[in-house]
Regions:
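Basic/aromatic recognition patch in beta-strand/loop cores that engages polyanionic ligands
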Residues: 48-77
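Enriched for short, Lys/Arg-rich terminal
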Residues: 68-95
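GIY-YIG nuclease signature motif recognition
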Residues: 9, 36, 72
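Arg/Lys-rich, positively charged N-terminal/basic patches that mediate binding to nucleic acids
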Residues: 1-33
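Alpha-helical linker/hinge and terminal dimerization helices associated
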Residues: 16, 36, 46-50
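Short proline/glycine- and basic residue-enriched helix-capping loop/turn segments at helix->loop/beta transitions
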Residues: 41-45
Length: 95
């Protein structure tokens, strides 16, 4: 399986990288991004790893990664990442 990002997930990751670099410096932000990519690779290898959660319109999977949650669905042979949100954000309202 491969992982794919929605436009919202790309924007989320861009925000995470920019804020991380601003608050913690480039090297820490880059390590955090590498950890996030490693988790995405893990999810592509084991797409059922995260538990299913019921959102208002669909069932999604939620995998914590650092201070963030990766919200995704399994579609055919791909892991489609819907959003990457901070753990304190209300993910149900933001899907």
């Amino acid at each position: 399986m491969t992982w794919l990002l929605t436009s919202a997930a790309i924007a989320d990751l861009d925000h995470v990288a920019a804020e991380g670099a601003r608050k913690y410096g480039f090297s820490k932000s880059e390590r955090y991004e590498q950890d996030m990519v490693a988790m995405l690779d893990t999810l592509a290898a084991m797409p059922q790893l995260a538990p299913e959660r019921q959102a208002s319109q669909q069932v999604v999977r939620l995998m914590p990664c650092g201070a963030h949650n990766i919200l995704y669905v399994v579609e055919k042979d791909d892991v489609l990442v819907l959003r990457v949100l901070h753990g304190l954000q209300n993910w149900i309202d933001l899907l």
